[in-house]
Amino acid sequence: MPRAELTLFAHIAARADGDLDLAQAALLIAEDEYPGLDVAAYIERLDVMGAGARKVLLDLDKPGDRRSQARLECALGFVYRELGFAGNAADYYDPRNSWLNDVLDRKVGIPITLAVVLLEIFARAGVEAAGVSFPGHFLVRSPGPSGPMFVDPFDGRILSREDLRELHGRVAGGPSDPDPRLLEPADKRQVLIRMLHNLRGIFAARGDRLRLRAILERLEILTPSDELRREIVSLGGESPIPPTKSRILN
């Protein structure tokens, strides 16, 4: 039988992507580290931040101008300058950078968790945006007047084409134009899966079997596989999804 704390996560993961609450699911990932985490309190904090961003944008908004670079820059300025969010360059692999509650408390994180903060604040402020599961560095995209604009959530910069070439060069062996498919919007499950893979890598490198198993159990709910089941069992756990049961994702 699955652990009780996985039940709500599995229920949310079974929803259609449009109905999946990204912030809630991301906060539930932290429940293994923080039992009894007050998820609703953190959602309320995002609501307050989103309302603040919406208020800042009111003075800027003009009819037909909701996709301007100036509007996106204003929203980013609110998150990074006024609220004070920043990338944690000093301790990039601190697991607290991957727990959304810690990111909201400490206001530092890595690209993917800062992207979740951006996406949640933007959604509440009326700024259209989506995550981008770019290799090696998660991004955020927002519609612009002449095509999508891309944001580095680590520092809140709007990226130029050359910036994207350099980012792609980190995994391609030299600056080069990324395949357009790498810049497509990521669905919410992809965001959660990538968050879990980051934590998986951290705890595997540390040899932290207990925390690694907890992450793998959540990962298997999103991406069931025999390989994951075997790894969970090898770590002393029980697969949340028995092989005879239907998988949540097809």
How should these model regions be labeled?
Residues 1-240, 248-250:
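A structural boundary/capping signal
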